[in-house]
Regions:
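Amphipathic alpha-helical binding modules
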Residues: 99-144
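Short terminal alpha-helical segments
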Residues: 1-59
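Short amphipathic alpha-helical heptad-repeat segments
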Residues: 87-105
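Structural recognition of alpha-solenoid helical scaffolds
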Residues: 46, 65, 90-95, 122, ...
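Extended non-catalytic scaffold regions that mediate assembly and binding
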Residues: 23-41, 69-88
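Compact disulfide-stabilized, cysteine-rich extracellular microdomains and processed peptide cores
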Residues: 43, 47-72, 76, 114
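Non-Sec secretion/translocation targeting segments of pathogen effectors
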Residues: 146-148, 155, 161-175
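Charged, low-complexity interaction regions
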Residues: 19-24, 63, 88, 105-117
Length: 175
């Protein structure tokens, strides 16, 4: 499993238009006998699974300090109130994870925060960008291995062609 797959496996969920719906109490009149229940969002099972996986991801990756998502975003110059407008091309993978966690945690204080980010495509955009970090990683590893092999071959190869030419010229000069 790739590093961010626990989150990015949900991309297909966000490509649909079925995320959940608002529950609005229309049966009760607000009297003491029939108090009105505050509106809330009933998310689909797929969105509930995503929310659970976000929490699981935070627990599994303590090195990212995502429990302090606010601090992680501040370190990257991202104002949590402007998170949806953040330029994701300039944000690293940990910053993207912090944006996702912030959005999920916002639901506790603002019903419908996740639904809004589903409908406007914000979560889909963040998850697609996060997936690009997983896709880029194998290429980065290949490049690093090539560079490492070049370094080791030049440092271990004392009989390289330029080295041999230099040695031959020293012999012919009598040095």
């Amino acid at each position: 499993m790739s590093k961010f797959e626990l989150l990015t496996k949900h991309i297909e969920t966000f490509e649909s238009d079925n995320f959940g719906e608002w529950f609005i109490d229309k049966e009760n009149d607000g009297s003491p006998e029939h108090p009105i229940q505050m509106p809330y969002v009933m998310y689909t099972r797929a969105i509930d699974d995503f929310i659970e996986d976000v929490h699981r991801f935070v627990d599994q990756h303590k090195e990212m300090r995502l429990t302090n998502y606010h601090g992680v975003l501040e370190e990257r110059g991202i104002d949590i109130g402007e998170a949806k407008q953040a330029d994701i091309e300039k944000i690293d993978a940990i910053g993207l994870c912090a944006l996702i966690v912030a959005n999920v945690r916002a639901e506790r204080f603002c019903d419908g925060a996740i639904l809004s980010s589903c409908k406007d495509g914000t979560l889909l955009k963040w998850l697609n960008k996060l997936r690009s970090f997983d896709e880029k990683k194998p290429l980065d590893e290949v490049i690093k291995r090539i560079e490492d092999s070049k370094k080791s071959s030049t440092s271990t190869s004392s009989n390289s062609k330029p080295q041999r030419i230099l040695e031959k010229s020293k012999i012919s000069d009598g040095r």
